[in-house]
Amino acid sequence: MEERSGVLETSRSCKQLIGPEGSDKEFEGYIDSNLRVVETFLRLFPIGLCVTALVIMLKNSQENKYGSVSYTDLGAFRYLVHANGICAGYSLFSAIFVALPRLSSVHIAWTFFVLDQVLTYIILSAGAASAEVLYLAEKGNMATAWSSACRSFGPFCHKVTASTTITFVVVVFYVLLSLISSYKLFSKYDAPTVSNPSMGADIVAFHG
């Protein structure tokens, strides 16, 4: 009887040890699954926004008695079109890739981390450049004797405002995506190591 009771106690203790680990794994799987769903939608939403901003700017031209103006006349607006096109393509590709289950490795995590950062800065710089040009078109510049162009080309400026505003909304989405890709990389994988031949050992590249 004592031997049997000892076996039962041992099995119970094993279950107690295994139980929390199993529940932790289930919880981590639940978090990863929900995070993948959220990330997929965050990558899908910018597609429509980028395409909308791109189309608005592409069709933006005006001609009246004062002359004619088109988005192609200004480099900042051309940059905005290209940036939104790149953003739409990358968002679609990355959303499809993220939605696929069990495709995760340190190389993939690093790739998404870097690309998300790059896209964030590309979209941000495109929006900032367009906003600066729009400000000059709206307010003019007394120091250089530039008058307000938007007084003569109001509809053109309104479309620029709409396209630029949508672009900044896309920036918000990509800031969130950058945070998610950073979390997925640095919470799951160790810091990269750099070989040091003189010491004959590997050194962690990040110092905490």
UniProtKB/Swiss-Prot annotation:
This chain's protein is named CASP-like protein 2A1
- The stretches that face the Extracellular side, renumbered to this chain, are 58-79, 129-159
Principal location class: membrane
Give GO cellular component annotations, separated by semicolons: plasma membrane
How does the record say this protein sits in the membrane? Multi-pass membrane protein
Q: How does it assemble?
A: Homodimer and heterodimers.
Family per similarity comment: Belongs to the Casparian strip membrane proteins (CASP) family.
Q: Which residues lie on this side of the membrane: Cytoplasmic?
A: 1-36, 101-107, 181-208
The places in or outside the cell where this protein is found are: Cell membrane
Q: Where are the transmembrane segments?
A: 37-57, 80-100, 108-128, 160-180
Report the InterPro entries cross-referenced here.
CASP/CASPL, CASP_dom
Quote any Pfam family the record assigns.
Answer: CASP_dom
NCBIfam families reported for this sequence: A_tha_TIGR01569 (TIGR01569)
Record lineage: Eukaryota, Viridiplantae, Streptophyta, Embryophyta, Tracheophyta
Keyword Transmembrane attributed: yes
Instruction: Extract the PANTHER family matched here.
Output: CASP-LIKE PROTEIN 2A1, CASP-LIKE PROTEIN 4A4
